[in-house]
Curated annotation (Swiss-Prot):
It comes from Ralstonia pickettii (strain 12J). Belongs to the methylthiotransferase family. RimO subfamily. Its cofactor is [4Fe-4S] cluster. This is Ribosomal protein uS12 methylthiotransferase RimO. Catalyzes the methylthiolation of an aspartic acid residue of ribosomal protein uS12. It comes from the Bacteria.
Length: 453
């Protein structure tokens, strides 16, 4: 539960799911505070509870249903929002209300207006709002030194394993000036790292035909390359980082490489490749193919040798043969992907992949995921070992009695590795959370680094 305090009436808040859902939660909490509601850190201290759910995979659905049940048991007045709110069961009934019929209201994701309307219905807003208590950057649920910057909502792809478009809709890009203003407010508030997120960052502006916008009196196209360039220029004025997530490997990404090579944005790409064998990609209804992607990765690294590539994959997709899986293992080794995650395929209710023949047993899916991660860890370990002896710029996330924990440009929060920093040997070398420090790397394993200032 999130804890921000001021005055009553009081709303409890539970936020589940991905960074896109976290941004939705931040927007709702910001509006609640602007209208004078207090955010309670406990169920018992709240007049009602809002639960922002995730509905992407079965485990997330169960976690969300459990959270709703806990909120109902502890408080009794619950409003539900998020991706699970848009899902229905096989009979066409809302999943949430079929399990928890006593919830006050249910909305889908990215539904600020509907959530606030439900709150107003069941907990009238105060007469005197406290909009002056809400900072220009809004209320954030991340640490003060980094923040997620969502540039669009929804997705135009129809991947067979995914139901996100049915929950979040087609691509809707935010106006470029609106994105830039939010970024500026975050940087002015002391944010040291902007994490650009969406369902498909490469497609930013496609829905508005790359419409020309304006920022600070200058024309700025609603397009990934132009937006990233402007964000990098803005962040450099504050000595901050810009990190790109959910970037499809389209040719347009080539245009961003010079910006990374020049240091305007971090040399880091989060590219969700999912597989490498063309037949599996076809069954997944995924764009691109492994050979072209491998050529593109090589070209990117020629322009930006320091580039870190993170990706996610699915092992054990329906119909995946041992030969197809071996192609995937060969690909991650040849591509030398720096950071990877792998999920054993799990059927998602409503996904068209459920109708594909050749479903694999659970033990085969898990065994392939484990084999994948063994190869991936060896690749990662080789790359991290090459960093030993080098000095890296590290953003400190926390400080404790054992020293500090931070991240290099190659590490996004929560999903990548960490840099463990020895306690400062001299007073002038002290650091705190949110500081950038130069760390000499003294050790590495398959995931993390160790070093000293």
């Amino acid at each position: 539960m999130s804890d921000v305090s001021t005055q009553s009436p009081k709303v409890g808040f539970v936020s589940l799911g991905c960074p896109k859902a976290l941004v939705d939660s931040e927007q709702i909490i910001t509006q609640l505070r602007a209208e004078g509601y207090e955010i309670s850190g406990t169920y018992g201290g709240a007049d009602l509870v809002v639960v922002n759910t995730c509905g992407f995979i079965d485990e997330a659905v169960q976690e969300s249903l459990d959270a709703i049940g806990e909120a109902l048991a502890e408080n009794g007045k619950v409003i539900v929002t998020g991706c699970l709110g848009a899902k229905k069961d096989a009979s066409g009934q809302d999943i949430i209300t079929s399990v928890h019929p006593k919830v006050l209201a249910v909305t889908g994701p990215h539904a600020l207006g509907e959530v606030m309307e439900a709150v107003h219905t069941h907990l009238p807003k105060p007469h005197d709002p406290f909009i002056d208590l809400v900072p220009p950057q809004g209320i954030k649920l991340t640490p003060k030194h980094y923040a997620y910057l969502k540039i669009s909502e929804g997705c135009n792809h129809r991947c067979s394993f995914c139901i996100i478009p049915s929950m979040r809709g087609d691509l809707v890009s935010r106006p470029v000036a609106e994105v830039m203003l939010e970024a500026e407010n975050l940087l002015k508030a002391g944010v040291k790292e902007l994490l650009v997120i969406s369902q498909d960052t490469s497609a930013y502006g496609v829905d508005v035909k790359f419409r020309m916008g304006f920022w600070n009196g200058r024309p700025l196209k609603t397009r990934m390359t132009e937006l990233v360039g402007a964000l990098g220029e803005l962040a450099s004025q504050y000595g901050a980082w810009v990190r790109l997530h959910y970037v499809y490997p389209y040719p347009s990404v080539d245009e961003v490489m010079p910006l990374m090579a020049e240091g305007k944005v971090l040399p880091y790409l989060d590219v969700p490749l999912q597989h490498a064998h063309p037949d599996v990609l076809k069954r997944m209804k995924r764009p691109a193919n492994a050979e072209k992607t491998l050529d593109r990765i090589r070209a990117w690294r020629e322009v930006c040798p320091e580039l870190t590539i993170r990706s996610t994959f699915i092992a054990g997709f329906p119909g995946e043969t041992e030969e197809e899986f071996q192609t995937l293992l060969d690909f991650i080794a040849e591509a030398e992907l720096d950071r990877v995650g792998c999920f054993a395929y799990s059927p998602v209710e409503g996904a068209t992949a459920n109708d594909l023949p050749g479903a694999l047993p659970d033990e085969v899916r898990e065994e392939r995921r484990a084999r994948f991660m063994e190869v991936a860890e060896r690749v990662s370990a080789r790359g991290l070992q090459r960093k030993v002896g080098k000095s890296l710029r590290v953003l400190v996330d926390e400080v404790n009695q054992d020293g500090g924990i931070g991240r290099s440009s190659a590490d996004a929060p929560e999903i990548d590795g960490l840099v463990y920093i020895a306690p400062p040997s001299k007073p002038y070398k002290r650091y705190k959370a949110g500081d950038f420090v130069s760390v000499k790397i003294t050790g590495a394993d398959g995931h993390d680094l160790w070093g000293e200032v």
